[in-house]
């Protein structure tokens, strides 16, 4: 663990990554001694309210985390940082974002869980912006200038005050991951969560932790008192939501969208819920131990794209089977008016035979609230996400580039990832194309 005392003693000269979390109320001046080397500065979980004017002297700084501090506005000095491209003000007290306070080279901007009611017109100048996290604010509309953000691939708009979504949003040429649940436009939809069986925390015993995501922690558990209406094994999985708001939106929306999605052979089956003042949780069937995560989450460098262990390999036949299963699952979701919003290898479980299970509806959205044209465009956006998944998997099939199967997958990938949403294939068409090559 890095400490302020060690920083002041000169121990950290020439380091590239610094993390300090000591309830700081003022920016440590000693950090400027690292201006020629520091690339990542993590000052999350402090009590900072401002940055000094000299902050622009951090010439090599690329990544800045100011999560869970007390900022009420974004310091304008950030715009003068020449290499700064990833910025997080998650969980602060931001009520506004002023014009021209962000570096034009920003690629990844996290403003989740603040009180922002409007974005500045200057956000349209962020031509390199790929990832934008805005969930848990008070946005009523998006500035039209954002249609100039042609490199935007992922945007989280959940848990705001949006009444409509602009048509230009669905026409962004690289957009592949979009979430908008928990806005005013979604409140007209009748909740379906009441149809799910409810259980209490006393009905099961938690065991070991299985995993953790943006919205919750998953544990293995065993039924102590299984309701007679539930047909499941004694061993189950329990997803306990972390709080009222996550980076993807409201947990209650995840529950509703998960239920509306219905059952499919490749979806992790949901069997019950816990809804109380103390806790919100989802009860799911336990995934067999032979399944493992297909990929790892994006890194600070890859931004929107998943990462993979160096040892990861797949045959083209396995890739076809996985992508075919995913395309058919997404066909099912969109027929049930649900978009997933988080189509990634790291949310996908597979076994050695390329059998696939898919879950995590934290970024899902109810498409019933959209006009028909936007519903169709939303499918095109998720088709692009499927293309990105295929693009991530193809490099894992080493030395198979010249095979007919590989070339066929390349063509499908290019069709999925094309910029024009009006020319995008449907999931039904993709399923039929892939079946030819099984």
Where do the protein language model's features map onto the residues?
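Protein kinase glycine-rich loop
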Residues: 207-213, 218
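ATP-binding glycine-rich loop module of kinase domains
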Residues: 217-257
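C-lobe/activation-segment region of protein kinase-like
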Residues: 357, 362-415
């Amino acid at each position: 663990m890095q400490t302020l005392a060690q920083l002041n003693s000169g121990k950290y000269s020439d380091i590239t990554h610094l993390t300090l979390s000591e309830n700081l109320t003022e920016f440590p001046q000693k950090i400027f001694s690292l201006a020629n080397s520091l690339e990542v500065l993590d000052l999350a979980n402090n009590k900072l309210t401002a940055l000094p004017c000299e902050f622009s002297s951090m010439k090599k700084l690329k990544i800045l985390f100011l999560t869970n501090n007390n900022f009420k506005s974004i310091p304008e000095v950030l715009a003068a940082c020449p290499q700064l491209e990833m910025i997080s003000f998650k969980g602060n007290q931001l009520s506004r974002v002023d014009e021209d306070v962000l570096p034009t080279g920003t690629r990844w901007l996290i403003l989740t869980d603040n009180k922002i009611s409007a974005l500045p017109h200057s956000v349209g100048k962020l031509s390199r912006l790929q990832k934008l996290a805005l969930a848990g604010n008070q946005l009523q509309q998006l500035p039209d200038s954002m249609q100039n953000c042609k490199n935007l691939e992922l945007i989280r708009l959940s848990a705001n005050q949006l009444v409509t979504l602009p048509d230009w949003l669905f026409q962004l040429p690289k957009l592949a991951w979009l979430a908008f649940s928990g806005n005013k436009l979604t409140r007209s939809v009748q909740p379906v969560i009441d149809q799910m069986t409810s259980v209490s925390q006393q009905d099961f015993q938690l065991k070991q932790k299985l995993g953790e995501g943006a919205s919750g922690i998953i544990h293995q558990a065993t039924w102590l008192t299984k309701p007679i209406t539930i047909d499941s094994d004694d061993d189950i999985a329990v997803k306990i939501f972390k709080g009222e708001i996550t980076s993807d939106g409201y947990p209650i929306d995840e529950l509703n969208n998960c239920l509306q999605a219905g059952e499919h052979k490749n979806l992790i089956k949901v069997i019950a819920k816990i809804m109380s003042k103390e806790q919100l949780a989802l009860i799911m069937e336990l995934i067999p131990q032979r399944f493992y995560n297909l990929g790892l989450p994006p890194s600070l460098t890859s931004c929107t794209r998943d990462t993979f262990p160096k040892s990861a390999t797949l045959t083209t036949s396995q890739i076809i089977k996985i992508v075919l299963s995913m395309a058919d699952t997404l066909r099912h979701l969109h027929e049930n008016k649900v978009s997933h919003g988080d189509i990634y290898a790291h949310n996908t479980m597979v076994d050695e035979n390329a059998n696939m299970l898919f879950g995590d509806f934290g970024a899902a959205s109810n498409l019933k609230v959209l006009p028909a044209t936007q519903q169709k465009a939303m499918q095109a956006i998720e088709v692009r996400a499927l293309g990105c998944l295929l693009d991530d998997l193809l490099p894992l099939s080493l030395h198979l580039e010249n095979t007919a199967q590989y070339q066929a997958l390349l063509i499908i990938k290019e069709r999925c990832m094309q910029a024009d949403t009006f020319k995008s294939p449907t999931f039904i068409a993709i399923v039929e194309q892939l079946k030819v090559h099984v």
